[in-house]
């Protein structure tokens, strides 16, 4: 089954995880506190991805979803995962903790250490805000502890949100399906989407983009999309990495250009900028032809310039050849 993702018309700022991953790889971010912050974000992203895969596997095809949606209702708040069925709206707060999480008297501890943020309150607040925005539409708040090695102990009575562990998610989805079939309620999905769009905001904590001048020779080059190793550009159709990943040459070029677009979001880019970003390893004419093939040119520019937008996503582009992983047995797999 294929869930449908809602288009809420957000602005073009990238998410912090993608931005920092590329910036750290290219040496644009080197401070240890920023790298530690990235590790925390990475853990959260892995948890959200794991949850999204479970939902995708078992959800109904007529349901709608949106990840990491920022909304405003007197104050700004984020919905980690918003799910709209035909009878109810569900807002999921997702936590990827390791070890024991304990909740007692409104206080949280993770592996015996008190933590300042309160995921129970986060889930409850998002639920209250959504109910305010959507009027009489049924809204349920759910806190999901998705960590594989996470023990959750809740001492307090909590009846205002549902609390799940990873192994509970499948059955929770089955319960939603059963409730949907039995419910006499049918909500107006288009009205809900319209209300949400009116209150959608860009991430208020968006990070500052880099300028083209920030990109030096030290930050240039090409990297493996699978393991992050530095690669050597060749004239072959596929660029090989020692990890076994073979990336289609055009895919590698466009992926790198998309990474540049992300790091400098809000600013359009030129052939020269991408040429430098790749480490000057391609002829300008060849690079120009590839960029013209996949990106939108801006008219009336003295220098050939391409539009930088959130649509510059290599995963949304269809290439005429696939990437490959070559195993020791010399068999290739998509």
Predicted regions and their residues:
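Short beta-strand element of the conserved SAM-dependent methyltransferase core
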Residues: 83, 239-241, 304-306
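Short acidic, glycine/Ser/Thr-rich loop/turn "cap" segments at secondary-structure junctions
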Residues: 104-116
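Short Lys/Arg-enriched helix C-cap and helix-to-coil transition segments
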Residues: 298-314
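Active-site beta-strand-loop-beta-strand hairpin of nuclease catalytic cores
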Residues: 83-106
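Residue-level signal for tight coil/turn positions that link beta-strands
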Residues: 86-87, 236, 301-302
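Surface-exposed interaction regions that form or flank ligand-binding interfaces
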Residues: 1-77, 113-284, 288-289, 310-334
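Catalytic centers of nucleases
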Residues: 70-91, 307
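Short, solvent-exposed alpha-helical "recognition" segments
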Residues: 290-299
């Amino acid at each position: 089954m294929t869930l449908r993702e809602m288009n809420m018309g957000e602005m073009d700022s990238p998410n912090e995880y993608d931005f920092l991953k590329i910036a750290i790889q290219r040496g644009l971010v080197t401070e240890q506190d920023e790298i530690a912050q990235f590790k925390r974000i990475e853990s959260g992203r892995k948890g959200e991805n794991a949850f999204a895969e479970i939902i995708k596997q078992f959800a109904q095809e007529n349901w709608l979803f949106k990840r990491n949606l920022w909304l405003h209702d007197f104050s700004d708040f984020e919905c980690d995962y918003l799910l709209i069925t035909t009878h109810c709206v569900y807002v999921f707060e997702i936590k990827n903790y390791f070890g024991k999480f304990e909740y007692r008297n409104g206080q949280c501890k993770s592996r015996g250490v008190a933590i300042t943020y309160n995921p129970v309150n986060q889930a409850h607040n998002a639920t209250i805000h959504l109910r305010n925005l959507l009027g009489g539409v049924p809204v349920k708040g759910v806190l999901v502890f998705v960590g594989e090695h996470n023990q959750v102990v809740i001492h307090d009575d909590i009846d205002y949100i549902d609390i799940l562990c990873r192994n509970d998610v499948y059955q929770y989805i089955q319960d939603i399906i059963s409730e949907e079939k039995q419910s006499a309620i049918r909500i107006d999905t288009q009205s809900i989407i319209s209300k949400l769009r009116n209150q959608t905001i860009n991430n208020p904590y968006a990070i500052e983009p880099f300028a083209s001048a920030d990109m030096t020779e030290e930050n240039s080059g090409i990297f493996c999309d699978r393991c992050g190793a530095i690669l050597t550009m060749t004239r072959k159709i596929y660029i090989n990495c020692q990890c076994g990943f073979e990336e289609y040459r055009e895919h590698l070029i466009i992926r790198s250009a998309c990474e540049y677009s992300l790091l400098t979001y809000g600013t359009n880019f030129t052939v020269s900028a991408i040429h430098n970003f790749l480490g000057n390893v391609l002829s300008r004419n060849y690079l120009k032809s590839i960029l013209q093939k996949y990106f939108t040119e801006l008219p009336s520019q003295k220098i050939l310039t391409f539009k930088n937008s959130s649509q510059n996503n290599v995963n949304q582009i269809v290439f005429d050849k696939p990437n490959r992983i070559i195993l020791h047995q010399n068999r290739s797999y998509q």
